[in-house]
Amino acid sequence: LGATAYWMIGNAFTKPPALLSPRGIVAREPVVDIDTALGGIEYSDAYIVDNDARFVFGFVRSALNSGAAVANYVELLDATRGPDGWVAQLRDTDAGRDFQLTAKVVINCAGPFVDGLNDKLGITTKHSIVMSKGIHLLVPRIAGQERVLAFYDDTERLFYVIPMGPRSCIGTTDDRVDTAYTEVTDGDRDFLLDQINARLQLDEPLTPDDIISSRCGVRPLVVEGGGEGTENEDWTSLSRKHAMEVDKSKKFITIFGGKLTDCVNVGNEVARAVGRLGLKLERDRKSWYGEPPKATKTEFFRQARLMHLDKLRQRASFETLSTRLWRRYGLRAFAMLEAIRDDPTMANDIIAGAEYVRVELYYAAQTEMITTLDDFLRRRSKIALVLSYEEIREAEGIHEACRLLFGDEAQKRYDEYFTPEREASVTKLREPDAKFPGHPQAQGGGLPAAG
């Protein structure tokens, strides 16, 4: 009933939910262990094929194309309100240069740092945030289909197996923390591996040695007041929705919490609030983001088919190159077709197994605001999620990427990323313990680092 109601709330846009018997489950996904299963539900929904950072940058790039001014690696040092509006003291953290900016309205959407920023600027609100830590582990591909598998863990919280190209992304956890700066612990890792091994019929159980990379972060959850009294609440019952407060006298807007899937609605709400504070906005034509019109898509795939784009690939892939370029870049993919026509090697992978071709790298260097190698590997692409630390470090293509992205600073940016500290942290993620006695290093074998 819950799945059907949720489907109806979405205007029945996708296929209707289906109730599955244990046999129906294993017919669709043989890897699922049905020994203790009473049944399951097949539900159609959207998921992010690349990663959340790439999804968000799609909005940033579209906003830039529509005339927005955007900057990254800028820190707000302080801001004061004067008779003519706000005066912000800012710092370019990469160049170490301070500068000043004026603004009629300030919007605090700093996620887990929202309360600290409000305190710093003297803003009083009815809401605040508490933080929930979540992690994901990337392992070799588990299920063959492009399906997200969802299970209840031993604490009755949902966790997922999400396809990510040649890998599977397992997670997430949901634990209260008091700081936004978190990392994957042995306990986090062991919990997820235990849960997934108990619910899948794998040839060999997953161990720390199978971990290719990890993700870790916090969710800012909105609460009333200062969050007092929530310590003993069911953590998963706290709302994932957002709250917005507007200080009309100071022309200051604060956004608490929220989910990525609701980002357009939150943006529209903020735009209306900005308008009520006296700023005149351009009329929303609802065409600056999202997929271009169907006729444009049809023309792109026609051109890709005529130039035999997908046959240029020398390696097997989990999606065709034409599909991937259109999904990631939309209108901007037409220029990539032209570049590949001129030089077919532009359709080659920059790093084997990364599913990221040379023409994307050239485009990223020109248009994707890449300042550090971490930007490129984790935020504009998913290379650092689907390939191990060692694979990336030893790949010839990483040096080509650094030269193209950073020019004279190529070696500097390479050295910033490949540090002993980073190698130690990713090696620790794969270290054995008593829970996994069959792990190679537990028996004295060698263990390569992964990231």
Can you annotate each of these PLM segments?
Residues 74, 167-168:
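Core alpha/beta catalytic barrel or barrel-like domain that forms the active/cofactor pocket
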Residues 81-85, 90-162:
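Flavin-dependent oxidoreductases
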Residues 73-78, 131, 210-212, 285-287:
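Beta-strand segments within the central parallel beta-sheet cores of soluble alpha/beta enzyme folds
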Residues 76-79, 160-161, 244:
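A structural signal for short hydrophobic beta-strand segments in well-ordered beta-sheet cores
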Residues 42-105, 264:
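Helical element adjacent to the flavin cofactor pocket in flavoenzyme catalytic cores
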Residues 1-3, 8, 13-36, 41, ...:
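C-terminal accessory subdomains/tails of enzymes that are appended
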Residues 18, 69, 99, 130, ...:
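Residues that recognize and position ribonucleotide moieties
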